[in-house]
Amino acid sequence: MASSYLTKTFGSPTDQNKWTFSAWVKLGQATSDSVIFSAGTNASNNIDGIKMDTQDLRVFSYPGSYVFHLISNRKFRDLSAWYHFQVAYDSDQSTAADRVKCYVNGTQLSSFSTETYPSSGANSGHINLNGREHIIGADTGGANNNINGYVTHC
C-alpha cells in the first residue's frame, strides 16, 4: 500500500464546537497508530485524531491535555471489510456522552475502554482552527503513522 495522504491548512476558522468526520476505511493490517484523520501541530504530540490503535478505534483531542479521549472496546479485525467511520462532535450538548459520538456502519459505539468527554462548550483543540494542518491518512507535522489501508469518500 502506498503511503499517500491528503493535507489542507485552513485559513478561515469555522466552528470548533461542532463538526463531523466521515469516511469509508479498509484496513490493510491491524497496526498501532494507523491514522485515519488528524489535525494540529504535532509539537509534543499536540494533535487531534481518529486512528486505529492495533484493533481499537481511538478518537481524541490533545492540545496539551485531553479535551476528549475515547478508545472503543469493539475490535476491528476483518481486513477484507470496508468500515464506515463517523465521528460527530458537538460540545454544546447538555449530556456529556452526546458531545462526542462515534458510529461504525451506522451503529453508534457505546462501549469504551477509555471514555473522557469534553466539558460543555469546549473547543475541540485543533479541528477547524485557523492555520492548523488537517490530514487524511497520516499524522500532522511530518505525515507519520500513515494509515495501513484505504480511505475514501470523506
Which ranges hold each PLM region?
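Extracellular glycan-associated modules
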Residues: 1-153
